[in-house]
């Protein structure tokens, strides 16, 4: 079916909740995707950070296919080997004690909020349930995680929203301290605010948050849905901050292309989550976990060294481009701020030349597969240089 027919059918029957690019992708390999008419794209979005090993990695595809031919689903009434195998790897890799599996980042963050409140209510009583998040954060689109998201643009509809969430400006420890009271149970943050503009938190601020949580016995939740599993050049972005959270959430790149969410809890918080406190019919699905095991196994020292090398190469090349004001993020989570052109216009022009990129507010956002080569980086920089070199100054446009 050609692209026009695919788009027409989608627009007729699929709920219009997405502002899609006018692109149909039919197949892919590595960093490259192809449309029905043979259009080829160099993908620096990786499905918003999901395809960590690129399209159709051979070992990943074989593991998923093999498991699908053995046993595709059981629910959590029974044990399956891929689930426990993945949980052990994640605990050993991160130092956490237990894992709960769901199907998305929003589900993982819901689970983290529930676990934090359960710990606090068990130890301090039923009123200690407030979670403080940061302004410009993004934690999901369920009612609870939408409420946790510190951006008013997401709070215009769907009310009434859940009670029990407050927002502190990122980087201001005094403002956070002022919000903490007897009803506070947790602080939840992204170390790099992805949807909020690819902005990394200051290390001193992060350590001050950890100290405050220790002093008040607040549960510290770090949302690594977008930053985790090698994206920043370490398995967790927490490693850049020498930070040990009470709860870490993962999703996106963990599954390598299949839906997964994970809540990693330390022993203190995990102890309160017994049978019946939480659940998921599809969580820990053996097919998904088979793929995730391949992803985690791939994240060895040499793999992460290449992530860091390519990040240095990419950032150095971007710094030489016209119109570039600043570069944000860590590793291969890259935000580009422009002086005088709109990120949305850059995105559209790149797409026309076969390079797929993202935006985050007024910034261009790059989330390439972690398997990229030096040649892939050179090709992307070549397109960006051509696009930006041809652009006239305009007023930047913010993207919701």
Positions of PLM-derived features:
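Conserved N-terminal phosphate-binding loop of PLP-dependent enzymes in the Aspartate aminotransferase
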Residues: 1-400
């Amino acid at each position: 079916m050609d692209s026009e027919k695919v788009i027409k059918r989608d627009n007729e029957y699929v709920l219009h909740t997405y502002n899609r690019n006018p692109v149909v992708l039919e197949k892919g390999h590595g960093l490259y995707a192809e449309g029905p008419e043979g259009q080829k794209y160099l993908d620096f979005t990786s499905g918003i950070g999901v395809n960590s090993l690129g399209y159709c990695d051979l070992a990943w595809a074989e593991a998923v296919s093999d498991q699908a031919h053995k046993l595709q689903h059981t629910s959590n009434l029974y044990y399956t080997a891929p689930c426990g195998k993945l949980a052990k790897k994640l605990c050993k890799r991160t130092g956490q004690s237990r894992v709960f599996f769901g199907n998305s980042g929003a589900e993982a963050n819901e689970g983290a909020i529930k676990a934090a409140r359960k710990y606090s209510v068990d130890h301090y009583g039923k009123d200690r349930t407030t979670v403080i998040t940061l302004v410009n954060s993004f934690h999901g689109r369920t009612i609870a995680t939408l409420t946790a998201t510190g951006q008013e643009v997401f709070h215009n509809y769907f009310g009434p929203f859940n009670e029990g969430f407050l927002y502190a400006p990122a980087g201001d420890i005094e403002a956070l301290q002022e919000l903490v009271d007897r009803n506070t149970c947790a602080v939840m943050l992204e170390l790099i605010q992805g949807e909020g503009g690819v902005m990394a938190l200051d290390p001193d601020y992060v350590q001050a948050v950890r100290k405050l949580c220790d002093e008040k016995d607040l549960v510290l939740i770090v949302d690594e849905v977008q930053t985790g599993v090698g994206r920043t050049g370490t398995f967790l972005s927490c490693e850049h901050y020498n930070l040990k959270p009470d709860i870490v959430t993962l999703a996106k790149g963990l599954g390598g292309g299949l839906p997964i969410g994970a809540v990693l809890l330390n022993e203190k918080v995990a102890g309160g989550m017994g049978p019946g406190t939480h659940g998921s019919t599809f969580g820990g699905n053996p097919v998904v976990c088979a793929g995730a095991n391949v992803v985690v196994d791939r994240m060895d020292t040499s793999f992460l060294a290449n992530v860091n090398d390519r990040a240095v190469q990419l950032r150095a090349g971007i710094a030489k481009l016209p119109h570039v004001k600043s570069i944000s993020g860590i590793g291969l989570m890259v935000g580009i701020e422009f002086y005088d052109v709109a990120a949305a216009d850059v995105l559209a022009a790149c797409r026309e030349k076969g390079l797929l990129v993202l935006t985050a507010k007024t910034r261009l956002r790059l989330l390439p597969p972690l398997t990229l080569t030096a040649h892939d980086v050179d090709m992307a920089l070549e397109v960006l240089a051509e696009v930006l070199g041809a652009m006239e100054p305009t007023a930047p446009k913010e993207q919701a």
